[in-house]
Amino acid sequence: MTLRKINFVTGNAKKLQEVKEILKGFEVTNVDVDLNEYQGEPEFIAQKKCQEAVEAVKGPVLVEDTSLCFNAMGGLPGPYIKWFLTNLKPDGLYNMLTGFADKTAYAQCIFAYTEGLGKPIHVFAGKCPGQIVAPRGDTSFGWDPCFQPDGFEETFGEMDKDVKNEISHRSKALDLLKEYFEKN
């Protein structure tokens, strides 16, 4: 049996590493295409990125859009987390909730996949509920040090990567992608 090849369009080395670890048994190749940053609902953003990526790659592509949503703020920063994190860092994200009793949040990951130009785009979403805490642990991957998933005493930044890759929003979305591949 040959491995299914997946062209994952990302410029984020840490995301690529996690996707490769979660999709063991697949041949994941990184394609670095500079995609536009779209605004809107996360599923719309993922679909637009997938359309743009397939036009550049001219073959099967997988793209991802990640959100970190604070319940006290009606879901913000949501899909704009990249910009918030760039400017505020994990400490600033935590401090955003200083005036709120509700520190609950959820991490959401939307993958969009298509076999090629003119083919349908399939969307796979995963969510991980948790709370925003003072940053702890490894600070090398985005907001991981300030997100503590429900049922755990550790932040994503403190967790063993194998544990994180079993429970994360990314792994939940990729589990749905694997199910799709098993059927198609």
From Swiss-Prot:
Its EC number is 3.6.1.66. Its cofactor is Mg(2+); Mn(2+). It catalyses: ITP + H2O = IMP + diphosphate + H(+); dITP + H2O = dIMP + diphosphate + H(+); XTP + H2O = XMP + diphosphate + H(+). It is found in: Cytoplasm. Mg(2+) binds at residue 37. SUPFAM superfamilies: ITPase-like. GO terms for biological process: deoxyribonucleoside triphosphate catabolic process; nucleoside triphosphate catabolic process; nucleotide metabolic process. Binds 1 divalent metal cation per subunit; can use either Mg(2+) or Mn(2+). One of its GO terms (cellular component) is cytoplasm. The keyword Hydrolase applies. One of its GO terms (molecular function) is nucleoside triphosphate diphosphatase activity. The keyword DNA-binding does not apply. ITP binds at residues 10-15, 49, 65-66, 82, 141-144, 164, 169-170. Keywords: Cytoplasm, Hydrolase, Magnesium, Manganese, Metal-binding, Nucleotide metabolism, Nucleotide-binding. NCBIfam families: RdgB/HAM1 family non-canonical purine NTP pyrophosphatase. Homodimer. Belongs to the HAM1 NTPase family. Pyrophosphatase that hydrolyzes non-canonical purine nucleotides such as inosine triphosphate (ITP), deoxyinosine triphosphate (dITP) or xanthosine 5'-triphosphate (XTP) to their respective monophosphate derivatives. The enzyme does not distinguish between the deoxy- and ribose forms. Probably excludes non-canonical purines from RNA and DNA precursor pools, thus preventing their incorporation into RNA and DNA and avoiding chromosomal lesions. This is Inosine triphosphate pyrophosphatase. It comes from Caenorhabditis briggsae.
